[in-house]
From Swiss-Prot:
GO terms for cellular component: ribonucleoprotein complex; ribosome. The lineage of its organism: Bacteria, Pseudomonadati, Pseudomonadota, Betaproteobacteria, Burkholderiales. It comes from Paraburkholderia xenovorans (strain LB400). This is Small ribosomal subunit protein bS21B. Belongs to the bacterial ribosomal protein bS21 family. It holds the Pfam family Ribosomal_S21. It comes from the Bacteria. Disulfide bonds: none annotated.
Length: 70
């Protein structure tokens, strides 16, 4: 359970922003969304493999030399 302590004279918006940041760091919302519906093991493997391929090509694209313009 994520908790934050609201400081004296702290605006609500600032406290809410801090709470959202801590929730994002823990990864609780992403896990909750993933567990909302059952996902078959084959579908999970397929999704994870596609994500790995996407990360690989993204990394390669960052290492490529720029094209020469002439």
């Amino acid at each position: 359970m994520t908790t934050i302590r609201v400081k004296d004279n702290e605006p609500f918006e600032v406290a809410m922003r801090r709470f959202k940041r801590t929730m994002e760091k823990t990864g609780l919302l992403t896990e909750l969304r993933a567990r909302e519906f059952y996902e078959k093991p084959t579908a999970e493997r397929k999704r994870k493999k596609a994500a790995a391929v996407k990360r690989h090509f993204k990394r390669l694209r960052g290492q490529m030399l720029p094209k020469k313009f002439y």
